[in-house]
């Protein structure tokens, strides 16, 4: 399929050790490859292995993650690193079953680590792979459904286990599928079909369904919160507070704020006479 024709250069592919693959895959969730590269380099320099990550204080690993967002990702990385140290002697396991027991690792990440780092014949099905396979097969199933993802994983698993005896290299196959979806079989009805190695037998193209496949239900609308924020200064210092350990932006620091939009007079009155009930002091 021409698996190396459109592989992007990335630091985690130069030396696909399990730790590098793991960190990169978690960083790449909800984040573009080019945006991840400098954060990956900084993180690896500071925390080059599982042992260093497991021993890292929270404030430090949160600071290293600063700018990537979705901070639960790095909290889960730290918790999983502690698991690996305690249960596996610091060695990242090489089977999907064991990887799935680690905090924050789902079926895609487990498949990516097992196949890319250890060359195990297991699939790594992300959004790109779902799109590619759905189009090649003209499958109009809703890819947002877990049952559809699971069925695709089972089909790819069976195929890979068979084809590995015919020379299929799992790490290259999975990376090629990911790259095909990211660079050629792109979303939003604008794929580069003429560049695709599967051009001749892509059923969605042959049936003129490229614009309608894959089928994907809309995500829930974002909840919007309205708050009044207080920037309280004392010389060069600004007052901050730490958010609760659970919930939205758990454990991060924020400017003091209260629910709702207050007029200037209301805000000034609240600032000069705060009470625990209004939330400014909590």
Give residue ranges: language-model regions:
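N-terminal strand-loop-strand
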Residues: 210-258
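Catalytic cores of DNA base-excision repair glycosylases
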Residues: 8-192, 198-207
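Structured beta->alpha junctions
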Residues: 16, 117, 244-245, 259
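Conserved small/polar residues in nucleotide/adenosyl-binding loops
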Residues: 1-9, 271-276
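A generic structural signal for well-ordered coil/turn residues at beta-strand boundaries
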Residues: 173, 179, 192, 226-227, ...
